[in-house]
Amino acid sequence: MSMLRAIGGELQCLFPMNPHGQERFEWFVLTLKAILVPITVSRTSNLRRAIATLFGVSIAEWRYDTFMASVKLPWEAVWETLWRAIPQPLVEGRLLLALDDSINPKTGRHIFACQTTFDHAAKANQTRWPWAQTLVTLGLLMPIHGRWCCLPMAFRFYLRRATLQAGCLRVRGKAVVFADKFAQAVSMIVSLARCFQTARVLVITDSWFGNNGLFRPLRQPLGTRVDLLSRLRVNAVLYAQPEAVPGKLGRPRKYGARLGSVAECAKQQRAKARCYQVRVYGATREVEAADQVVMLKTLRCAVRVVWVYRRSQWVALMTTDLRLSVAQIVEYYSARWKIEAGFRELKQEIGSAATQTRHPDAVTNHLHFCMVATTLTWIYAAHLKQAPARRYASQSTTEYAFADVRRALAKDIAEEGFGSDCPKSGKAQRKSFISEVMRLVA
């Protein structure tokens, strides 16, 4: 049984077995297939037309819009099914989770979760305060056929307190309660960690999330099996580990002598730097780095700090997992960049940014569909015996891309789909039609 048929059978069990439930399942799978086939942008209207054109299923416009805004889609169970379907999700015994936030600019009012948001990455010709949705996203980092990939696992819409105070925002009749990004991140990580109860969890973040606002709430439900890997700010102060003084009365010291700021220690550690062979950004490179175990007051525990030196710059990384080697720390943090590539795959290639929906449930369901499609694509890649060939290879880029996996998946969808989701009549005709359209698009 193929991967698509196996997952399709598990997803079918999540829907009621009555006629309405099975019709909802059929439309659910058809929507996923329409997103996965790289032919059109994933607007709701485009998806309905793609379903009619490619798969021969005509759905009334009002019925399909009602389905896309349905409150009966079992997303929690769908995500848990996908989490368990990932082959070999652990990397050296750890679950590597990338955490970051992104913005999704929109045009038009009365769009759910839109607010005036500060964009720190805005270019010179872009506004610093766009009208956009803010997404806190959790992804799974894992190597697939020799390259790091980021599989979207969960997301939350972040709404500022000022936005909620300006107007009462309701979803399904209930007022939206403010939750900061740390609380949203903790809820997603805890849910995912409970699905993998025996695995150690390493959360890889940028410097904004790398503090006790995230680490302390995570340690309460998950204990010592969760650790943090982040980048250090240059002005963070480091302390030596405390030394026990025999015979001294009173409470033992929590911190040793002050070592200085990260920038000051970087100059001192430069003479102790060594060269390591690390796989970074798709190639094995020689990295000059130095490390030291110190105390950090922002986390109130011992951390391993790694200074990575370049020609004229340096970067300081820290982790609470003292068992990680220098090479592992550098490689895992460099793999964090794949979540940024995942945002591009989700917004531009899958087309989540092009949605025109405004209703809260429709906006949320559409993003769920796009993220599930992205994760399914990478799960499909992990089940392939060998990596697909890169379509537009060059001397500097030889690894396969997300679009290459999606193209191979579209061919399998044309062959068999998810099993019981295709009507029996006209199957061969639709199969050849999809293949012809794929050839024209390519």
Short names for language-model regions:
Residues 29-36, 135, 369, 373-380:
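Short, amphipathic alpha-helical segments that act as regulatory/interfacial helices
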Residues 1-71, 75:
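Gly/serine-rich nucleotide phosphate-binding loop at the start of the catalytic core
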Residues 18-29, 125-131, 357-367:
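Structural motif
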Residues 2-16, 106, 110-111, 150, ...:
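Single, function-defining residue in the core of a domain
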Residues 36-39, 67-75, 123, 127, ...:
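Short secondary-structure transition/capping motifs
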Residues 66-161, 290:
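Active-site-proximal, Lys/Arg-enriched surface segment
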